Regions:
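"Rare, low-scoring activations can occur
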Residues: 2-18, 71, 78-83, 88, ...
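A glycine-biased structural micro-motif
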Residues: 92-94
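Structured, solvent-exposed hinge/loop segments at the ends of secondary-structure elements
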Residues: 1-84, 88-90, 99-102
Length: 198
């Protein structure tokens, strides 16, 4: 798999402390609906997919664990736990599906965290969650934790991505690589510039 080659090559860099799969991140999460048994939308989950390594890299703390994390299950925040009445005796929520299972099966509870950019706020019916992926599923994003000089590490990552792209697809394509902190700063700057223009 091409992403595995990229992940392993990045992980081998001296500037990289850890590299693992993720599909999106807390800043660029997406919305998944929560429905009652009549299929009425009752809430929204702001989600991204991550494995346990990515969760540790992002500083996400597990509060309770109900079962082994497996693909198809989710981690919910303390806020979502309260909103949907989740417990060790009721580790599910959402409408009942045709196979008898519920829309969401919960493997555990994580500490509340902020999703979206620095100014984003969840609506009253929006809650955060992380879908479980395992190293076998892979992902479309490689999350990387660096060490040492940030600019030097970023350049090493970009060079490696370009080199791997050339080896795999024949073209030294640029890949998007940015620190989450920089993404947040740029979002704030963009919002500030927009306010100044208005």
């Amino acid at each position: 798999e091409k992403m595995a080659i990229l992940k392993n090559r990045l992980k081998a860099l001296p500037e990289v402390e850890e590299a693992t799969y993720g599909n999106a991140n807390p800043i660029s999460s997406w919305g998944n609906g929560v429905h009652d048994d009549n299929e009425k939308l009752i809430g929204m989950l702001r989600m991204f997919l991550a494995d346990s390594t990515a969760m540790k890299m992002l500083g996400i703390r597990v509060i309770e664990q109900y079962c082994e994390p497996a693909y198809g299950k989710i981690w919910v925040t303390e806020d979502a736990k309260r909103a949907y009445g989740i417990s060790a005796h009721k580790p599910w929520f959402g409408m009942r599906m045709q196979d008898g299972k519920h829309e969401y099966e919960v493997c555990g509870v994580i500490a509340d965290y902020h999703s979206g950019d620095a100014l984003s706020e969840n609506e009253k019916t929006e809650h955060n969650a992380i879908g479980v992926i395992t190293p076998q599923q892979g992902g479309w994003v490689v999350l990387v934790k660096t060490r040492g000089d940030h600019a030097q590490a970023l350049q090493a990552i970009r060079n490696t991505c370009k080199q791997v792209a050339k080896e795999l697809i024949g073209v030294p394509a640029e890949m998007e690589a940015e620190y989450l902190d920089d993404t947040l700063k740029n979002n704030l700057k963009d919002k500030h510039n927009m306010m100044v223009l208005i």
